[in-house]
């Protein structure tokens, strides 16, 4: 009797195990577009690598004193932590390997920059994809990568060379990203064919803070002047390095529809600390009175007015103005 009972338990366990295996297989097959978009963004190398692991591991040798001596005396793990802190990099939750979340491993030890370089940040120790990376030091990182490559006699690549004549960002957390797009598009025709003989375009260099991506779904247009309609194609502009021809963009278009789905799936993270309800209510009333006309409102019924406000430098228009 006892033997039959244990056999029944065994059969039940086997059935449960097979059911669980089937469930996990179904879940794997049923990856949503948003999940697929984030997976692609965080694991697929769309560009050539900017540097390799050897270069990254030796960046500390370019640092000023006393930081360089502190790094020299530290172990490899502590030097890595110091480098992540210096350049505004974070660990990649759930992704194995030494490469920071802001980059993708090309499978040969190369670090390939991704959209998450500017669009994955950290607050109070928590890594949040979609949060502006207010700590990213692209200019400093690129300068020190170039110096390290020259010492190691490694070849320079597009980022190392382009940054000699073009500012990448004047402060941590900001980049000259709009001009990156202007420069890359200048050498393409309407069919995205590359024309290397074209002159360099006139550019107005200026730094931008990256926006929080969970607000994108509220907008019809992107950027401060709303000149680009929201969609998956504007997301692809930073892939326009010359080695990526028109056929690559046709191949990748559906993948960036998934990336857009990920962006539109994002919600603002909940504030983790205590809230002064009275003060928040007073702030909400002030925000609706003074700011909401231009900046929109939040919550389940939130709206974004998509206003383009002309700015006369001699008489700037304040938020809430009816002019």
Where is each model-derived feature located?
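N-terminal secretory signal peptides that target proteins for export/translocation
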Residues: 1-8
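Bacterial N-terminal signal peptides
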Residues: 11-22
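Boundary at the C-terminal end of the N-terminal hydrophobic targeting segment
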Residues: 25-30
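Extracytoplasmic redox metalloprotein regions
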Residues: 45-49, 53-54, 65-251
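Electrostatic cytochrome c docking/interface patches
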Residues: 93-106, 261-287, 296-311, 315-316
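The canonical Cys-X-X-Cys-His
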Residues: 112-122, 213, 259, 283-298
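Glycine-rich, acidic and aromatic/proline-enriched surface loops and short helix-turn segments
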Residues: 215-219, 252-265
